[in-house]
Amino acid sequence: MLDPSTAGPLTDAPASSLRSILVHVDATTESATRLLVACDLAERHRATVRALFGTAPMADTGSFGYSAGAALDDATALRSLRLEQARAHLQRSLGDRAPDVAWYDVVGETVGHGFLQEAVFADLVVLGQQSASVGRNGGAPAGFVELVAMEGGRPTLVIPHVLSTDAVGRRVLIAWNGSAQAARSVSGALPLLHAADEVHAVTWGRGPSIAPFSRLDIRQHLAGHGIAVTTHQRAPSAHVGEDLIAVAQALGSDLIVMGCYGHGRATERVLGGATRSILRKMTVPVLMVH
């Protein structure tokens, strides 16, 4: 039984409230877009924003005649320089919002593990889409998005390279297939779904209930949360990722909510086909949970 003397204060915040956002920033120009999205969401949901700077390990700065210590000193100095340059650039991009962001650096940990340690205290984490040049020019290390999405256990919002607006979540599209991953993603997205102007759900094959013996479907489930959903049924497809992007474009969606599918191995994480396709070809932000 709870001891009333140790219980926290009661609040009127809903159980699905969004109060803490962690965003990954690095030395790439796309970091500003991620931060602006995070700040816009924070303003709408009265949340705090923490920006965690982390890049792939610096390229080997040693050369013939360099000692290991000198090379390490050079790499540390380069990292510090990149951090200060990135922070100055991002603060200029944020303008009046800059004082509201708490800034951190990954120290003494790999970027992935350092970020995962901070992510456990976030209601939402914000990452950037990775490209073929991943890890170069001050970006995140290879496999960073997969690591956070599959092992972080938090709703993960991935922002595409090119984004026309920082107002994300006005028109939301849910990719629904009745899986545990899709259900966790919908639960993680509830604060955004509550605040959205429109919510759509797309299914492939059977329709919104998916499970043949289910007494509920996604419309009824979200109606119980006070969220109205328009459903769309598509024919079964071998290219669900591409089809999902096409549906999002046709509806004018600015956010896709979907499960993150894949499995981890000892040294790598293998994404499912639809998840991999979306992360490569995404044109709007995607919120996912493994």
Language model features: what each stretch is:
Residues M1-A13, R92-V125, A132, H225-I256, ...:
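Structural beta-alpha unit
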Residues P14, Q117-E118, V148, L192, ...:
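Structural alpha-helical scaffold elements that stabilize or flank donor/cofactor-binding regions
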Residues L127-Q129, P155-V162, L287-H290:
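Short beta-strand elements of ligand-binding domains
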Residues A71-Q85:
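A short acidic, glycine-rich active-site loop
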